[in-house]
Swiss-Prot record:
GO annotation, biological process: photosynthesis
Protein's name in the database: Photosystem II reaction center protein K
Gene name of the record: psbK
Self-association state and partner proteins as the record states: PSII is composed of 1 copy each of membrane proteins PsbA, PsbB, PsbC, PsbD, PsbE, PsbF, PsbH, PsbI, PsbJ, PsbK, PsbL, PsbM, PsbT, PsbX, PsbY, PsbZ, Psb30/Ycf12, at least 3 peripheral proteins of the oxygen-evolving complex and a large number of cofactors. It forms dimeric complexes.
Propeptide: 1-16
UniProt-listed InterPro entries: PSII_PsbK, PSII_PsbK_sf
Pfam families tied to this protein: PsbK
Organism from which the protein derives: Huperzia lucidula
Keywords on record: Chloroplast, Membrane, Photosynthesis, Photosystem II, Plastid, Reaction center, Thylakoid, Transmembrane, Transmembrane helix
Length: 53
């Protein structure tokens, strides 16, 4: 029982500080969903550069 309680306390403390610890990377996380669109557009740029062969 004590082990279960200590594990829960550890997880609460660890995950409570996690968002604050990663606050620096918040702007990067906001841009990340757009990155696959760049690869999609890159395919068209590549095909345009080889004249859509």
């Amino acid at each position: 029982m004590l082990k279960f309680y200590l594990e829960n306390v550890f997880h609460l403390i660890f995950f409570a500080k996690l968002p604050e610890a990663y606050a620096v990377s918040d702007p990067i996380v906001n841009v990340m969903p757009i990155i696959p669109l760049f690869f999609f557009l890159l395919a068209f740029v590549w095909q345009a550069s080889v004249s859509f062969r």
